[in-house]
Structure formats: structure tokens, C-alpha cells
Amino acid sequence: MNSLWKIAHKWSNNRGGVRKYLSRTIELMLFIVNSNSVSVKASIGTNTIFHHHGIGCVVHDNAVIGENCHIFQNVTLGSKWSHGKLDGGAPIIGNNVLIGAGAVILGNIKVGDNVNIGANAVVITDIPDNSIAVGVPAKIISKG
């Protein structure tokens, strides 16, 4: 998934033409094969890995993911429903972040560098650098 996504992301910025069409085709193919919706408009840093082919992952168009991150299956990085409407913001994930299986990170929030997000955690507030966050809603259990 990672290599194909990078090609689609690069081509998605072309205005019209064959490459833009191929970008959408690759995005659709990844959705069908891996049951994921990782937007080619999202910004994903180098050496970031979607484990298990990113099965079930959803990444918002405006999400930013740093370098050297590990994202496991069924992770959602999306906008938050607030006061009867979507807030439109998407998470910004720092460098060297591990996001456990099934974690949900919602809204215009920042997850710092060197953070571990536990499996099935629901993150709706900022998480500082060098922290471990777990639970629903996520709570910081360790600061480095």
C-alpha cells in the first residue's frame, strides 16, 4: 500500500490529465483491496508504515502524519462532529508516533513527537511530546 499511495499522492496534485485520473484510480483500488480510505490529499511523512496493508484505516484529506510513524489496522484520523456539524479540522501527527489498532484520533488536534497511542484509544485533545495515551477518552498515562 505504501508505495502505491506515494505515487497516487504525487500525481494527485496534477491539474487534470492522465496522472490525476490514475491517482484516483489507485486510491479506489486501495479502497477495494484493503478496505481503507487513506486520502491521497493527506500529507504522510517518509518511512511511515501502515501495518497490515492499512486494512480498515481512514485518513482525512487534511490530516498530516509525520515521519517514521507506525499505524496499525482500523485506525481513523478524521474530523470531529461538534455542535451539529463537522468541524472540518483534521489531526496533525508528529514524528515517531505509534498508533495502535482501532485507535480514533478526531478533530483539529496535535499529537506530539515520540507518542504512543494505545489500541482502541479515542483521542480528542492534544497529546504532548513523549507521552503514552490510552483509553476512551484517551488519557495520558506517562510523560517522558
Can you name each region flagged by the protein language model?
Residues 40, 45-46, 51-52, 60-61, ...:
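Left-handed beta-helix
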Residues 134-144:
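Short, basic/aromatic-enriched C-terminal tail that caps enzymatic domains
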Residues 23-53:
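Long amphipathic N-terminal alpha/beta scaffold segment
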Residues 1-35, 138:
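Terminal amphipathic alpha-helical/low-complexity segments used for targeting or macromolecular assembly
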